């Protein structure tokens, strides 16, 4: 399985009694993990012992940190270099169980960045029967980004699943 999750993130999960806007808050705990819908799909594939490669943009120092965290989880990542820094997300988990997620948009990409991404997905599809496209795409990605990846899958005779807005 190839997982197209172009807009990776670093998630900072912050635990607190209650989120109160307009106040200075002290968190009870902080966990830093790689995130994004594609990473979640890769985790499920690993749990099911399904061979999978995640293809994502991994810009800057934060991209290098995410790449290391992804490897620490035993997930295979094909990182596509791009300028800027990887986006982050703040996940606030309250004692009540309520969750608030604040996502950054991700670094803007150019047309040639997306072309390199498509090439990485196409190359990764060799020997795989399924392409999963999951999560958001970075600013600057073509409006038909996932449609183009589905067409790549069709040319490779791979099934395609899209889970994105």
Residue spans for each PLM region:
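Short, well-ordered, mixed-charge alpha-helical segments that flank or form enzyme active sites
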Residues: 11, 109-112, 139-143
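Conserved N-terminal subdomain of the carbohydrate kinase-like
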Residues: 23, 46-130
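Glycine-rich phosphate/adenosyl-contacting loop at the front of the ribokinase-like
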Residues: 1-55, 64-65
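Short, solvent-exposed amphipathic alpha-helical segments in soluble enzyme
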Residues: 18-21, 69-73, 147-150
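Conserved beta-alpha-beta core of the PfkB/ribokinase-like small-molecule kinase fold
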Residues: 129-165
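General beta-strand structural signal in soluble alpha/beta enzymes
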Residues: 3-4, 56, 78-79, 132-133, ...
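Glycine-rich phosphate-binding "P-loop"
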Residues: 26-27, 31, 105-106, 133-135
